[in-house]
């Protein structure tokens, strides 16, 4: 077996955490590795009514038989990492690549203090942009320089590639979404690095020939936090009428809501090299679909929407989320692949 990468197709908050958790429980990876920018993105997973919001530890932590690795491309805030390790009780499984660059208090201050970043761009204020600047200038500290992290250091590419060579399954999760990519997103209203599947693979040290599948996650009603173009954005009143009111996991800011954007989704699927698509929020599209776990039980409206998505992205929709709980999902991978 090789690796599967899961990334966001819009502007983040697509429900990747839920999809990662489901694939982890069903496919049983030996390693769940995290790529992406850093603790500027939050992933939420809900199990048995209990919500977990994580910013550093891979959201697949809910699958207890996998090692949890953070790739060298990810910025690490030691305080956030250690707090999550303690809260989630994953100290025996969580490891950080020794080359990860470190977010220091000065980076957070610079992020929050910059009028350009905080007012114009709408940064999350977590220090990622300024830390990446230091990394590019080759002055950033690395995880190996931080005494508090010494018990958690690893060579992530070595572990991931050895597992793949041994025929074991590795799950790699990204953060944020395609629309926030520094290269392909709605520049300058983007994050501080690329967020596509190729970049996520690079973050954890996996070459393209090792990747078997790329699952791109879209939500029925795309959302974005902060400033920037949003072609299909709907008025807040319209979103409220539909019962869609959401807040960001990290910032607590209200998310902007939009209608499905097939053209953007197609471009995102193309650049990410999607082999499968996951759709979340079908229960927001049609409340009668809440908690449904079989394709046959979806309403005609929901089925028509899924068929439209497949026409737009030209890739099979294999996973359909029908609610926040882990078990509220339709898995069509056996039928469609």
Swiss-Prot record:
Its cofactor is Mg(2+). Mg(2+) binds at residues 13, 42. It holds the Pfam family Adenylsucc_synt. It is an enzyme of class 6 (ligase). Its EC number is 6.3.4.4. Homodimer. This is Adenylosuccinate synthetase. Pathway: Purine metabolism; AMP biosynthesis via de novo pathway; AMP from IMP: step 1/2. GTP binds at residues 12-18, 42-44, 255, 281-283, 321-323. IMP binds at residues 13-16, 40-43, 124, 138, 176, 191, 253. Substrate binds at residues 249-255. Keywords: Cytoplasm, GTP-binding, Ligase, Magnesium, Metal-binding, Nucleotide-binding, Purine biosynthesis. It catalyses: IMP + L-aspartate + GTP = N(6)-(1,2-dicarboxyethyl)-AMP + GDP + phosphate + 2 H(+). One of its GO terms (molecular function) is GTP binding. Transmembrane segments: none annotated. GO terms for cellular component: cytoplasm. The active site is at 13 (proton acceptor), 43 (proton donor).
